[in-house]
Amino acid sequence: METINTTERLAALRDLMKKNKVDIYIVPSEDSHSSEYIAACDARREFISGFSGSAGCAVVTLDKAALATDDNWLLLKQGLQDVPTWQEWAAEQSESGKVVGVDSTIISAPDARKLLEKVKKRGGSDLVAVEENLVDLVWGDNRPSRPKEPVKVLARGFSGKDVKTKLEDLRKELQKKKSSGFIVSMLDEIAWLFNLRGSDIPYNPVFFSYASVTPSSATLYVDSSKLSEECITHLNDNGVSIREYSKIFSDVEVLSQSLDSEDAKLKKFLVSSRASWALKRALGGDAKVDEVRSPIGDAKSIKNETELEGMRACHIRDGAALIEYFAWLEHQLVVEKVEMDEVIAADKLEQLRSKQKHFVGLSFDTISSTGANAAVIHYKPEPGNCSIIDPKAVYLCDSGAQYFDGTTDTTRTLHFGEPTEMEKKAYTLVLKGNIALDVAVFPKGTSGFALDALARQFLWEEGLDYRHGTGHGVGSYLNVHEGPIGIGTRIQYSEVPLAPGNVISNEPGYYEDGSFGIRIENIIMVKEVETKHQFGDKPYLGFEHVTMVPYCRKLIDETLLTRREKHWLNEYHADIYSKTKDFFKGDELTMSWLEREIEPL
């Protein structure tokens, strides 16, 4: 791994801070669209800090610099007891009237508001929007260019719903909220709304854009050079105007002026609660804007039947690729005695996936991790800086792919030698939690917050736990992490009940630092189920699993499983066999591995 000396960069940034009369400068991880994954041109926090982790925020003063990140990284444990958040640390530094600055296009309006409150409380002077991004100025000509990848139309056979219908549904929501319009800033929401896909951000089939939808108009803001004639015709046919990406802020200022009349004052514009501070300011601030949970995000999270069928189909193909990979990997390590590192193994898995129908690319960096590396939740092996896979240790593989008909995310933990009793016990407790969530039946209106304990209960009985959520929403040929639903202890997961059509992960785990890690992840879909009674006349819901990859037989301690759990496991494995066996005709190695792993308990 390349070592980055950030001393000169920080010195240059501090010079610019002085010129702009800023004492403290905030460098978030996000781009202008609050994206989880970002393009290289937006990796400002990594550039200034040298830290390439998946989440965090850099705070730079004239004589100090701090980096806060989530507790999936052990080097800095924001979110743990007695460790301040970046907002708290920045506010502490702002005492005695100091000024805090930030690029207002890359911080959300709620985050900016919370930061200002903390700064004022600690005696700071103000939070100011610095017009030019100071890190970009330090980066200069070496900053990567903004991607200009082509945008493509997603066929109706994959989307399941046309753009006109989606716009009609959105306008009904605007009418309910008595709103003048919705300014859309989340890239996956724009891609979904207009049935378009791109590749501007690694692993996410999205493209840089904004959108504006009013009762009488719809406008897509995008670099028009990225649009083919097919895209232009597609948008025009659906009543969507095209404007250049750079015009969004000037255009929303004009839209804001339309609210100056007495008749319009009660009809605010809506923005997502993750929209940037800059966007909200351009629209006129609180007087003219309401921050809401995005109605597009809500609609997108409930898949239509075409999308659900696509998820079923792509998970069968993806499962076949994973089964072939695990059989191949075991043979290479155990029989051929090949020394293989984590990256080479991950590359082989990508190669096998790429042969599957409708394959587009990966949905995130493959976590191919052996031994102690498996205990690092967001571990990312790098060429030249990864481990040789140890056949005598636990191997955890968390991976996924993008297909035209869906998005996959599967984790399996395997052992190619003789696991310890603790490894088997931990694996089986995690498996029991995975099964408990899969078979859960619950009344309509139940949130993922309420279900989280089902997956943890068997670990809790032993005084064990894991420091991550149990489930995240999954897009349909879109982002692998999709809101607003989730299963976990975060209070936000109590705000949105699960609904039929939701697609979500089921991924309990257990990790022993420096030793091993266990995680089992299936993708499950919410559906209505029949129950003998319906208390309160409420429908009851359950799950349908679509992941088709067997569990590791060697790691299962059968004595810890109930008869019901064994029956469920045998039925699941039989289902996998029936749906994937035709992929392995003539492939004795893979078929032999599969038959061994699914042998009934």
UniProtKB/Swiss-Prot annotation:
An example Gene Ontology CC term for this record: cytoplasm
Protease listed as a keyword: yes
UniProt xrefs under PROSITE patterns: PROLINE_PEPTIDASE
Entry's EC annotation: 3.4.11.9
Cofactor mode of binding and number, as noted: Binds 2 manganese ions per subunit.
Cofactor(s) this protein requires: Mn(2+)
Catalysed reaction equations from the record: Release of any N-terminal amino acid, including proline, that is linked to proline, even from a dipeptide or tripeptide
Xref: Pfam families: Creatinase_N, Creatinase_N_2, Peptidase_M24, Peptidase_M24_C
Binding site for Mn(2+) 2: 398, 409, 521
Annotated GO MF terms: metal ion binding; metalloaminopeptidase activity
Domain of life from the UniProt record: Eukaryota
Keyword line: Aminopeptidase, Hydrolase, Manganese, Metal-binding, Metalloprotease, Protease
UniProt record, GO biological process: proteolysis
Residue sites binding Mn(2+) 1 per the record: 409, 507, 521
Family: Belongs to the peptidase M24B family.
Role description: Catalyzes the removal of a penultimate prolyl residue from the N-termini of peptides.
Protein's name according to its UniProt entry: Probable Xaa-Pro aminopeptidase P
Organism: Sclerotinia sclerotiorum (strain ATCC 18683 / 1980 / Ss-1) (White mold)
Gene from which this protein is expressed: ampp
